A protein has these predicted regions:
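Conserved catalytic segment of ABC-fold P-loop ATPases
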Residues: 196-204
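Conserved beta-strand-loop-alpha-helix hinge in the C-terminal portion
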Residues: 208-239
Length: 247
């Protein structure tokens, strides 16, 4: 898969969405913004399910300019799309190392689990141990581990992420990692800094994609300023977690 194309559906009132098509490519980061209830999660679900126009929104999703046949849709979706939700937990009761070895074997990937763990620990402030139980990991540790797993073990070219800024991890490193592995990354966010990380963002309202905005030069300059503030906030968070004074 090299491109994913969204074809318009309809909003909550039944009106057609105001775009012809939206083409997204591997290696691209695209953010999705809008008020609560604007349709962000529904858009993500349409992409995850490779919607054929029979769903609530009427949207259609093309892969490399073609529809995925109904009988293949479930299998293709499972292999092509990885979804990092806000609340994640493991049902497998085993250690981190055993999980990584098992997943690598299932995917027939020759990779050292220590390399995956090193990547995970680069984006979470609380280190993960190889012999630690999956079920004892915090929410941030879990998402960091899954981001590293998706980047290095999982072959899924499409990654859907819900509000990464709430995960307690370094979002810049996490998203840059996924892009560097040629993933198409779509991030639902309410945060201006996260939204401006992408060259393009989709604006949701009333259940529809109301606008596709390309980041302007002024917004790029604003992003640089917000990145400085983000780095400062990260440093203060580190001091706070260590029990040190902030001023």
């Amino acid at each position: 898969m090299q491109t994913l194309t969204l074809l318009p559906g309809r909003d909550k009132a039944g009106n057609p969405e105001p775009f012809d098509q939206i083409a997204l490519r591997r290696g691209e980061l695209c953010t999705i913004v809008g008020n609560t209830g604007s349709g962000k999660s529904r858009l993500i679900k349409d992409i995850e399910q490779l919607s054929d126009g029979t769903g609530v929104t009427g949207r259609r999703v093309l892969l490399d300019d073609g529809f995925v046949p109904l009988e293949q849709r479930q299998a293709v979706s499972t292999s092509l799309v990885a979804h990092l939700g806000q609340n994640m937990c493991f049902v497998l009761d085993t250690s981190v190392g055993a999980f990584l070895r098992l997943h690598a074997a299932c995917r027939q990937k020759e990779i050292r689990e220590s390399d995956v763990l090193a990547v995970a620990n680069d984006i979470t402030p609380e280190p993960i141990a190889m012999d630690e139980s999956l079920n004892l990991l915090s929410g941030g540790q879990t998402r960091a581990l899954m981001i590293a797993d998706i980047a290095l073990i999982c072959d899924s070219p499409i990654v859907l992420v819900d509000e990464i800024e709430n995960a307690g991890i370094d979002k810049q490193r996490a998203l840059s990692l996924l892009q560097s592995r040629e993933k198409l990354v779509l991030v639902v966010t309410h945060d201006p800094h996260t939204a401006l990380m992408a060259e393009r963002r989709l604006v949701m309202s009333g259940g529809a994609v109301k606008a596709v905005i390309t980041r302007s030069e002024r917004e790029a300059a604003l992003y640089d300023q917000l990145s400085i503030e983000y780095a400062r906030s990260q440093r203060l968070q580190t001091l706070l977690r260590k029990g040190e004074l902030l001023a």
